[in-house]
Amino acid sequence: MVESDKSSVEELKKRVRKRSRGKKNEQQKAEEKTHTVEENADETQKKSEKKVKKVRGKIEEEEEKVEAMEDGEDEKNIVIVGKGIMTNVTFDSLDLSEQTSIAIKEMGFQYMTQIQAGSIQPLLEGKDVLGAARTGSGKTLAFLIPAVELLFKERFSPRNGTGVIVICPTRELAIQTKNVAEELLKHHSQTVSMVIGGNNRRSEAQRIASGSNLVIATPGRLLDHLQNTKAFIYKHLKCLVIDEADRILEENFEEDMNKILKILPKTRQTALFSATQTSKVKDLARVSLTSPVHVDVDDGRRKVTNEGLEQGYCVVPSKQRLILLISFLKKNLNKKIMVFFSTCKSVQFHTEIMKISDVDVSDIHGGMDQNRRTKTFFDFMKAKKGILLCTDVAARGLDIPSVDWIIQYDPPDKPTEYIHRVGRTARGEGAKGKALLVLIPEELQFIRYLKAAKVPVKELEFNEKRLSNVQSALEKCVAKDYNLNKLAKDAYRAYLSAYNSHSLKDIFNVHRLDLLAVAESFCFSSPPKVNLNIESGAGKVRKARKQQGRNGFSPYSPYGKSTPTKEA
């Protein structure tokens, strides 16, 4: 009985040991399984961490690219920030030919301006460039130096035809650009010629046929030669430069430019320079440039006008405008002055009136013979003192040295035109100049537009007692002289017509003008009978006056009831 019990116990112990071994095996297997799962989890985690690192790396790379673009470090976007227009980068640092280097030194240049430092190297490398810089920043050398170097390296000769074309908005700017090009080409064998409206077309065609490697042109005349001068060899064109693109488009050359771009070879380098980046300029850049390097100059100036420029305006009744101008010019005969008018007829009339008033002046306007216009321009450029009466043909791009005063006798069409007009003075580092805008009381709200455009102007008062007492004498001269009387009528009509076409009609409304006072400013005792072809706007004026009344606006309260916007 006991033995059987013992055997039962032993058998029971064996079963227990068996079960425990089974449990241990199960536990061991479970542990191994758990360990395997953990290992797999670790591997998965490591893989995901690697992916995260890769993604983070890509994000960081993108952020670095964005930062580089914002900082102007990206190759396609060069933003130059600094004080003034000059840099400490020398022309010697460029890899230029000996001939060009000698010419630059002979011209008296050692250091580059900001637009030159940003544009010349990319252009030398054959890249397209879209340059944005204000007037007087040195854009001409920025594109002419690479143009001359390109012609030299490609070994262009007259038989190769034209390798570079430069398009300018005005004849005067084209003339000035050609002069600079001639100085740069002084020690080179390459040739330069100019094709502009007003010149003898046949002579231009002969020069082109003989082989002009560098052609400076205005849009209309260039298109004429491209379409009609069979001997014009432009199939080897390497580079097209569009200077003052915004002004070209403002002068309604958009259609001509599109035709020119269609005719010229597509495989070329293109450089486009513009003081302002309007929507039309961007459209032109889009169709003419390929992956351009953007060069944007920020010279650290808060003002949009030149640094050394003092700007003011005076409010004068219409009938006293002419007397004020004569008095001012007589007191400043030893200065170099440019006076801007809205029309050619007005320039012609005031030139005659100044002669009668013993004020020696010269004049430039679009209706002049080109030879006389060119001579007048260069005479005024070289003069240390003198008075030039002009239209806006002289408002852009021209580098006229040492201009003391810019007088805007007729107000500009918009703030940008004001900026370009006053840009003829205080040009270059450390230069000084003054500008005066003449307004009648009805035009005073124009100051709001200028201040919104960050143009700092202050009101200047004039002493009526010091004005020349010549009004009645001038009226008698105009009444007696048939030719002068006709010229005065034409100028009066042209002034009103230009006024009526003004873009800022909320300010420059011809129906608000006191025609008797306007007539007096053209030396008439009463308004002359002229056909103006101006639609009546009396109803609109009455409505506008009511609206102005609600807001407190008037010619004598240009800011209305609300506080005027502070100048930035």
From Swiss-Prot:
Keywords, A to Z, come to:
ATP-binding, Coiled coil, Helicase, Hydrolase, Nucleotide-binding, RNA-binding
Instruction: Please verify whether the record's keywords include Cell membrane.
Output: no
Q: Which positions are tagged coiled coil?
A: 13-78
Renumbered to this chain, the Acidic residues biased-composition regions fall at: 60-70
* Motif Q motif mapped to chain: 89-117
Q: Name one GO cellular component term.
A: nucleolus
Enzyme Commission number(s) of this protein: 3.6.4.13
Name the residue ranges of motif: DEAD box: 243-246
Which CDD domains does the entry link to? DEADc_DDX18 (cd17942), SF2_C_DEAD (cd18787)
Q: Where is the composition biased (Basic and acidic residues)?
A: 1-13, 23-47
Enumerate the GO terms in the molecular function aspect. Answer: ATP binding; ATP hydrolysis activity; RNA binding; RNA helicase activity
**Which intervals hold domain Helicase ATP-binding?**
120-295
From which domain of life does this come? Eukaryota
Q: What is known of its domains?
A: The Q motif is unique to and characteristic of the DEAD box family of RNA helicases and controls ATP binding and hydrolysis.
Q: Which family does it belong to?
A: Belongs to the DEAD box helicase family. DDX18/HAS1 subfamily.
In terms of PANTHER family, this protein maps to: RNA HELICASE
Q: What is this protein called?
A: DEAD-box ATP-dependent RNA helicase 51
Q: Which organism is it from?
A: Arabidopsis thaliana
